[in-house]
């Protein structure tokens, strides 16, 4: 990168009314301090900084299948068949999204196509 000569630097400094090369490298004001205070976090299950293993704070280990509180279905007793299983199996028909399709009949007049 090209730099200006001493005369050009002096001319720019004189025209601007201040020293432009004084803060050339540190041109950003928002530089944080090297020593930071410890963060003020709310107390929770993982607020400890030591002896806080990942496996103890993992929420997936606490997830379980849902427990059934109440069911509208009747529970069968082990070893007994269902009371109306034979009747219910014969009454059910296949579910279709539309009314049944009519079967087309071939024409009865001569000649057959």
From Swiss-Prot:
Which residues lie within the region annotated Disordered? 32-52, 80-113
Cell compartment(s), UniProt: Mitochondrion inner membrane
User: What GO cellular component entries does it have?
Assistant: mitochondrial inner membrane; mitochondrion; respiratory chain complex I
Q: Tell me the GO BP annotations in alphabetical order.
A: ATP synthesis coupled electron transport; mitochondrial electron transport, NADH to ubiquinone
Query: What are the UniProt keywords, alphabetically?
Result: Acetylation, Electron transport, Membrane, Mitochondrion, Mitochondrion inner membrane, Respiratory chain, Transport
Write down which residues bear the modification named N-acetylalanine: 2
The topology of this chain with respect to the membrane is:
Peripheral membrane protein
> From which domain of life does this come?
Eukaryota
- Xref: InterPro entries: NDUA7
Residues that bear N6-acetyllysine:
40
Is Flavoprotein one of the keywords? no
The UniProt GO MF terms for this protein read: oxidoreductase activity
Q: Which Pfam families match?
A: CI-B14_5a
What task does this protein carry out? Accessory subunit of the mitochondrial membrane respiratory chain NADH dehydrogenase (Complex I), that is believed not to be involved in catalysis. Complex I functions in the transfer of electrons from NADH to the respiratory chain. The immediate electron acceptor for the enzyme is believed to be ubiquinone.
Regarding protein family, the annotation reads:
Belongs to the complex I NDUFA7 subunit family.
Q: How does it assemble?
A: Complex I is composed of 45 different subunits.
State what protein this is by name.
NADH dehydrogenase [ubiquinone] 1 alpha subcomplex subunit 7
The record's gene field reads: NDUFA7
């Amino acid at each position: 990168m090209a730099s200006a000569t001493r005369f050009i630097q002096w001319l720019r400094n004189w025209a601007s009314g201040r020293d432009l090369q004084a803060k050339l490298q540190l041109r950003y004001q928002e530089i944080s301090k090297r020593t930071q205070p410890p963060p003020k976090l709310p107390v929770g299950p993982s607020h400890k900084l030591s002896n806080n293993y990942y496996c103890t704070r993992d929420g997936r280990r606490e997830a379980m299948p849902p427990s059934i509180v109440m069911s509208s279905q009747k529970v069968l007793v082990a070893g007994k068949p269902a009371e109306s299983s034979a009747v219910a199996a014969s009454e059910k028909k296949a579910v279709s999204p539309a009314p049944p399709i009519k079967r087309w009949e071939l024409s009865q007049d001569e000649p057959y196509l």
